[in-house]
A protein has these predicted regions:
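Conserved cofactor-binding/catalytic machinery of classical short-chain dehydrogenase/reductase
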Residues: 71, 113-116, 176-177
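N-terminal Rossmann NAD(P)H-binding glycine-rich loop of SDR-like oxidoreductase domains
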Residues: 3-35
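A structural signal for isolated positions on well-ordered beta-strands in alpha/beta enzyme cores
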Residues: 34-36, 63, 131
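Conserved glycine-rich Rossmann-like NAD(P)H-binding loop of the short-chain dehydrogenase/reductase
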Residues: 33-44
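NAD(P)H-binding glycine-rich loop region in Rossmannoid oxidoreductase-like domains
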Residues: 42-112, 122
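Conserved Rossmann-fold NAD(P)-dependent oxidoreductase catalytic core, especially the SDR/UDP-sugar
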Residues: 87, 91, 96-170
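Active-site YXXXK catalytic motif of short-chain dehydrogenase/reductase
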Residues: 170-178
Length: 180
């Protein structure tokens, strides 16, 4: 399958080391695109080794930038000259026992982080398109919603209505982040 993208400049992939974002980066590099990828800690080999290996295979290339979703302005350098922003950065915690503070662990980075990205887009005149990576959990919050799905095709009117900051906070935060 051929992956084509119409970009006259580099593109930004936030959270480039994440699972979905890494596959996107790989396909973009294979298509010859220059990718500006953001990672929270570019000195951590666990976060960047696989990205450097992708870049070596080309024909596109990756330039890594350190950025934090909650730090205003931290995406400015990474976004310079980019024409498309793929916002894929998002925390994801599988083990519920590791969720100490749903507001801090999910809501702030997902919702306020998305606001930060969109504000930086507004400040970057070269960006023409933003692609937000969301999740099915923005539509289906818990089992009750899965058991009573909307009829027909899903649309922008179909939202997760059962999650809250205290009940499935990841789903709630993804819903609120997408609603921006």
């Amino acid at each position: 399958m051929t992956f084509k993208i119409n970009s006259k400049g580099p593109v930004l992939v936030t959270g480039a080391n994440g699972f979905v974002a890494s596959w996107l980066v790989k396909r973009l590099v294979e298509a010859g695109v220059t990718v500006h990828g953001t990672v929270r800690d570019i000195s951590d080999p666990r976060k960047v080794t696989h990205l450097n290996q992708i870049s070596k295979k080309g024909p596109g290339k990756i330039k890594l930038f350190q950025a934090d979703l909650l730090e205003s302005g931290s995406y400015l350098d990474a976004m310079k000259k980019c024409t498309i922003v793929f916002h894929a950065a998002s925390p994801f915690i599988i083990d519920a026992k590791r969720i100490n503070n749903p507001q801090k662990d999910f809501y702030d980075p997902i919702v306020n982080g998305t606001k930060n990205i969109l504000q930086t887009v507004d400040d970057t005149k070269t960006v023409k398109k933003v692609v937000l990576t969301s999740s099915i959990v923005a539509v289906y919050g818990d089992l009750n919603e899965c058991l009573t799905p909307p009829q027909g095709m899903l649309s922008e009117k179909d939202w997760n209505k059962t999650s809250s900051i205290n009940h499935i906070p990841y789903s709630y935060s993804k819903t609120m982040g997408e609603k921006l």
